[in-house]
Amino acid sequence: MAFQAQDLDMIGKKDLLKVNGGVSAQTVFYSAQGLPARRDPFYWVVNANLTLNFMGISAPFSASFSSQESQFAQPFNQYGISPKYKAITAHIGWRSLNYSELTMAGMQFLGAGVEVEPKDIPIYVSALYGRFTKAIDPLNIPETAGSMPAYERWGMAAKIGYKPKFGQLNLTMFRGFENPASVTYTDPSLEVTPGANLTIGVNGKVKITRTTNLKFEYAHSIYTHNLNLEPSALDDFTYADNLGSLIPANA
């Protein structure tokens, strides 16, 4: 279920109440030959949406329900809300934000975020924190999920942007990390270890003509394969040792 942006600043400027929506349903038949079945041979999915607009406050609701929910390794039924007041938009619950293609590229997360975009100045900021995937314990994997064991994954991201008339410039950062304590046991042969990643990027565009824009993007990523290893110095990449708690450096 999802609640999208509601502009509280528009109260009294619209009709009192407007309602619209729709419902759709589908059934799926599944079969596999030569490999184990990854789901039931028959399942259904129902999608519904309802939009309420009360005195300028828009509250779009959407929901997806499936007979497979109890067998998915990751959540299928999800919900969230994104209320908006003037230049500030808050995001709570299951949300998806897109900062850039190389850092925070529209990944869904369960948590909280905020966007601030004033109308009178060309600067805007955004930040988020939340859980991106829940843990999949190797001792409790659904038989039809077709999933590998995985650690619980959390992340935080931030963006600051400048948008003059001739273009746009964004500085972005994403830090993701997996919780080593979220999985009780892993088979060494699977090579599943808790990792961490830090990505810092810059992107933007420059207006060349009325119909032509030059877009650019650059990002640099540092990845720690196993958080269970002891920290160590990296002589060839000394800048990584100065990033503090953002990314642990080890062999």
Where do the language-model regions lie?
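Bacterial Sec-dependent N-terminal signal peptides
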Residues: 1-7
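Outer-membrane beta-barrel channel domains
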Residues: 7-251
